[in-house]
Amino acid sequence: MGFPIPDPYVWDPSFRIFYSIIDDEHKTLFNGIFHLGHDDSADNLAELRRCTGKHFLNEQVLMQDSQYAGYAEHVRAHDGFIHQLDNWHGDVKWAKNWLVNHIKTIDFKYKGKI
């Protein structure tokens, strides 16, 4: 059971982590998946992959710097998403679901801890 997928697929305050850089990057990921859903092009996929890699790195550095206990679990989740992007089969619904549920379950665990 997961969280509802917003329609239209846009970031809203229910996804707020309260770290402005992370919230801004999450907005970018929502936009990237939204655009991929409207044009499943190599360029849109490459841009989503670039933004995702940057965001995951930034988030992981914050976790390492704060010695966040859930770091290893979080990195495994990130690695799984990157693997799916690197082996893309056009499943935008999966990507939408993954991001929504990742933020609201995995990311919400570090609120106030990094």
UniProtKB/Swiss-Prot annotation:
Keywords: Iron, Metal-binding, Oxygen transport, Transport. It holds the Pfam family Hemerythrin. Fe cation 1 binds at H26, H55, E59, D107. GO terms for molecular function: iron ion binding; oxygen carrier activity. The keyword Metal-binding applies. Fe cation 2 binds at E59, H74, H78, H102, D107. It comes from the Eukaryota. InterPro entries: Haemerythrin (IPR002063), Haemerythrin_Fe_BS (IPR016131), Hemerythrin (IPR050669), Hemerythrin-like (IPR012312), Hemerythrin-like_sf (IPR035938). Hemerythrin is a respiratory protein in blood cells of certain marine worms. The oxygen-binding site in each chain contains two iron atoms. Belongs to the hemerythrin family. This is Hemerythrin subunit 2. It comes from Golfingia vulgaris.
